[in-house]
Amino acid sequence: MSMFLDTAKISVQAGRGGDGMVAFRREKYVPNGGPWGGDGGKGGSVIFRVDEGLRTLMDFRYNRKFKAKSGEKGMTKGMHGRGAEDLIVFVPQGTTVRDAETGKVITDLVEHGQEVVIAKGGRGGRGNIRFATPRNPAPEIAENGEPGEERQLELELKILADVGLVGFPSVGKSTLLSVVSSAKPKIGAYHFTTIVPNLGMVRTKSGDSFAMADLPGLIEGASQGVGLGTQFLRHIERTRVILHVIDMSASEGRDPYEDYVSINNELETYNLRLMERPQIIVANKMDMPEAQENLKAFKKKLAAQYDEFDDLPMIFPISSLAHQGLENLLEATAELLAKTDEFLLYDEADLVDEEAYYGFAETEKDFEITRDDDATWVLSGEKLERLFVMTNMERDESIMKFARQLRGMGVDEALRERGAKDGDLVRIGKFEFEFVD
């Protein structure tokens, strides 16, 4: 049996490292001062942290982009730029993080307080003080900051509804769910309108959010497997609060109180613990004729079943179609959830083994060579492109250093083997230069 799945697609971008600085020491009594440019600060990483207080991924529907700050540039006197703070993103317990492009699982976040670096901040570029050598004591070389990692992610949260809607078919459960959430269940005036559970994420005006399930309609005999009863009951046993929806207009010709007793009998027959869940009675269709009189009769019959010292179940008169009484119902539901402990969450049958891919690093290719239609040689590859973006192309010494790095990686030799000749154009990104054999 599948669980409900809440999903969200987001983008994360770690901060860029600060650029290194080219600077020289110039003080009155220090002739021929050497390099004095400091390193750039590291970029902030994007870190996911588990918060057991979160129940849904609803917050990611409103905020889909997460970008950490960049590190500051290096300064004179060899001082490093300030590193950027990491961006902490809170996620619910049980969140699975996938790479949206490959579909691979990056990590499973299962423990409260667990942290995972989802996008690593870029390294700060080195200042010219780092490149001083006996042969070149005054280098005019500094690195640009390394770009931070950028990822498109898909978050999945296997969840079970906090709140379950129970009641006879056609009492208005699907309509209620569609009104208070973004769920779009199929709605019709016939029995077993809902044949599979529908899930909606509900947010109250006070900012609380919870998952509400509209479950397959229940009939007498469900606990013995009649109709869709077994499927219904296996879902409802995992909820923490039950909203018992009753058609107070009696439009189907049934007595509202008899409906209430019948449904509770099925819940008790299937599993005694179901009756331990706090239950709110939702008196629906109060905009219809006869509803007010039926509600009075219902309350009278209900009170007769309780001792004078017992607390009666809460009753909220509403009309889903007319949008009446919904705000008070949702606030009361959120308050009840806050003080209700969790019941059974998972069966062994619910747990799906799937291959997980942890970490980000795959085998990194140094470079690749292709040729455009205009005969330009095109260089690409993660390592090569990272070296390129960290090279300050406005300084000759930095360009010469980059050329030596390419030679050391074997790029020159590979171009010769592919047939490159002296004077051929070579392109990296938007930067073009001539190949010198």
Swiss-Prot record:
Residues 359-437 form the OCT domain. This is GTPase Obg. GO terms for molecular function: GTP binding; GTPase activity; magnesium ion binding. It holds the Pfam family DUF1967. It is found in: Cytoplasm. An essential GTPase which binds GTP, GDP and possibly (p)ppGpp with moderate affinity, with high nucleotide exchange rates and a fairly low GTP hydrolysis rate. Plays a role in control of the cell cycle, stress response, ribosome biogenesis and in those bacteria that undergo differentiation, in morphogenesis control. One of its GO terms (biological process) is ribosome biogenesis. Its cofactor is Mg(2+). Keywords: Cytoplasm, GTP-binding, Hydrolase, Magnesium, Metal-binding, Nucleotide-binding. GTP binds at residues 167-174, 192-196, 214-217, 284-287, 319-321. GO terms for cellular component: cytoplasm. The keyword Disulfide bond does not apply. InterPro entries: G_OBG, GTP-bd, GTP-bd_Obg/CgtA, GTP-bd_prot_GTP1/OBG_C_sf, GTP1-OBG_CS, GTP1_OBG_dom, GTP1_OBG_dom_sf, OBG_GTPase. It comes from the Bacteria. Belongs to the TRAFAC class OBG-HflX-like GTPase superfamily. OBG GTPase family. Its EC number is 3.6.5.-. It is an enzyme of class 3 (hydrolase). Residues 2-160 form the Obg domain. Monomer. Residues 161-338 form the OBG-type G domain. Mg(2+) binds at S174, T194.
